[in-house]
Amino acid sequence: MGKVLEYFNCGIIGYGKIGYSIGNHLLQRGIKPTVYDINPIKQISALNRECNIDNKNNIVSNSEVLFLATGNHSLNIHDFRKIKNGSYIFSVTSSDDELDDSYLETEYTIEEIKPNIYKYYNSNNWFYLVKKGNAVNFLHNAVMDDFIYLVMSEMIVAAQLLIKSQDLHKKNNILETNESVKKKISKIWLDVFKNGKY
């Protein structure tokens, strides 16, 4: 939109790997984001990395640029009503996972003002929801490029491990790919995409 990010109040909801990465990139640009996470350990981690921390309501109502990185319905209609006029909202997961948008279309008029930038407005407030709340990190192929194959490969291997696992039917059990699997996938990726062996 032709505006300089450094002059905006930036908020991050969710401080896992992706939220941490967003915060780190903002800090490198001289922007001190304000972070909220439901996990107090993550809040301390954000504070330790020199981010501000605050509660969700304050971040939603004060941020001019808001990054959503929870994958767990971080905003609902009550939150949307509090968003500061003119704010930009970016999600890094699908809108189904990140937003409870069931009332958005009935309460707001939606207008695409530029490709993938949608203005939501009513008599109460207005804001921009980039890509209608779907992942902006997949908006341009150049961002992910061939690196997406690392993620996809690990997902396939994880699914195979889950299917083969004896622990498949145990409740409250998380299976992860181990370091050796990740190294093997990374080596194959380097051979294919960096070294051109295949």
Task: Place the predicted regions along the sequence by residue.
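NAD(P)-binding Rossmann-fold cofactor-contacting core
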Residues: 13, 28-49
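Generic hydrophobic/aromatic pocket-lining and core-packing "Φ" positions
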Residues: 22-23, 43, 80
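Generic beta-strand/beta-sheet core signal
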Residues: 13-15, 29, 36, 54-56, ...
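Short, glycine-/Ser/Thr-/acidic-enriched flexible segments
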Residues: 17-18, 40-41, 72-73, 94-97, ...
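Hydrophobic alpha-helical scaffolding
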Residues: 12, 32-36, 53, 65, ...
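Adenosine-phosphate binding glycine-rich loop
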Residues: 1-4, 100-198
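Glycine-rich adenosine-cofactor-binding loop
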Residues: 1-27
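Rossmann-like adenosine-cofactor binding region
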Residues: 47-125
